């Protein structure tokens, strides 16, 4: 029996009820999770897979809340995240040492992001690697430079974001206009009686929050490991320029690096872009080799 064919609860019957129901599924200890994963891997035991899926439905819902600002029904976003969770359970290898939550976060986010991109493609939202990065990182980049105003960004803000994300100014302007709709409020009622709000459900999820924090710490460690391995593949100059431009809290300017290396500002920018593309390619290949993403 395939994991994808498992009967998993859906928020289609009412989001408030769904969120209440999934809280009834117990979390798994590390030993329980390992045992269930082995049962699925060795015997294709559907009950083992089902327990792994249901014990992580709250994790999916919590991750999905982070994508509520893209104008799509949150129930549909959760459903797509559940698809990613089932894929993670199918491919999970417990002997590699990390928990299912850590591994599943990659799949849940990828599934949700692909769904959002498919939905936004109806208005011809681009799907190049750079546009995907811009689509999912623009809000964070705006907050980092305190660009909280409504409407168009100031030219200096556009330039800062474009440099940080490695895209064109025009792409930042276009994407900002497409994503300028208001976010769903955390104070929006979950039920018709108005007694339960999004923030109530999120704040009460102490156990899943702890698991999420552990998973995020493990995921960060995995990403750092991939980054360190990929950096070795760069030349000394590429590594230095990329570090100075993209990995420091206070990036060195193109002009400063150009003076340091005795080349033009444009040449430094080209080296930075080339190094970043090489780094991304190497990290993705490593992630595929570790079975973290699809080829």
Swiss-Prot record:
A motif (Interaction with polymerase core subunit RpoC) lies at residues 76-79. It comes from Caulobacter vibrioides (strain ATCC 19089 / CIP 103742 / CB 15). GO terms for cellular component: cytoplasm. GO terms for biological process: DNA-templated transcription initiation; response to heat. The gene is rpoH. SUPFAM superfamilies: Sigma2 domain of RNA polymerase sigma factors, Sigma3 and sigma4 domains of RNA polymerase sigma factors. Residues 230-281 are annotated as: Sigma-70 factor domain-4. Belongs to the sigma-70 factor family. RpoH subfamily. This is RNA polymerase sigma factor RpoH. Residues 254-273 bind DNA. Residues 52-121 are annotated as: Sigma-70 factor domain-2. It comes from the Bacteria. Its main location: cytoplasm.
């Amino acid at each position: 029996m395939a994991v994808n064919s498992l009967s998993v609860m859906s928020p289609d019957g009412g989001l408030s009820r769904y969120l209440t129901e999934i809280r009834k599924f117990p979390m798994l200890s590390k030993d329980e999770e390992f045992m269930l994963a082995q049962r699925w891997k060795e015997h294709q035991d559907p009950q083992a897979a089902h327990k792994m899926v249901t014990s992580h439905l709250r994790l999916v819902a919590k991750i999905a809340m982070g994508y509520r600002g893209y104008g799509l029904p949150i129930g549909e976003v959760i459903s797509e995240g559940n698809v990613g969770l089932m894929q993670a359970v199918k491919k999970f290898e417990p002997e590699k040492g990390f928990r299912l939550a850590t591994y599943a976060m990659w799949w849940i986010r990828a599934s949700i992001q692909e769904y959002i991109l498919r939905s936004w493609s109806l208005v011809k939202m681009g799907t190049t690697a750079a546009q995907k990065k811009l689509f999912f990182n623009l809000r964070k980049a705006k907050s980092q430079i305190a660009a909280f105003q409504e409407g168009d960004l100031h030219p200096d803000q556009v330039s800062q974001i474009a440099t940080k994300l490695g895209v064109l100014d025009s792409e930042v302007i276009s994407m900002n206009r497409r994503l300028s709709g208001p976010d769903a409020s955390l104070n929006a009622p979950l039920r018709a009686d108005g007694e339960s709000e999004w923030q109530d459900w999120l704040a009460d999820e102490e156990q899943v929050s702890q698991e999420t924090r552990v998973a995020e710490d493990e995921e960060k460690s995995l990403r750092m490991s991939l980054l360190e391995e990929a950096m070795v593949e760069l030349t000394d100059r590429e590594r230095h320029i990329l570090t100075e431009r993209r990995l420091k809290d206070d990036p060195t300017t193109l002009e400063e690096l150009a003076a340091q290396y005795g080349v033009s500002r444009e040449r430094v920018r080209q080296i930075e872009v080339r190094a970043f593309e090489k780094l991304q390619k190497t990290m993705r290949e490593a992630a595929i080799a570790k079975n973290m993403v699809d080829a």
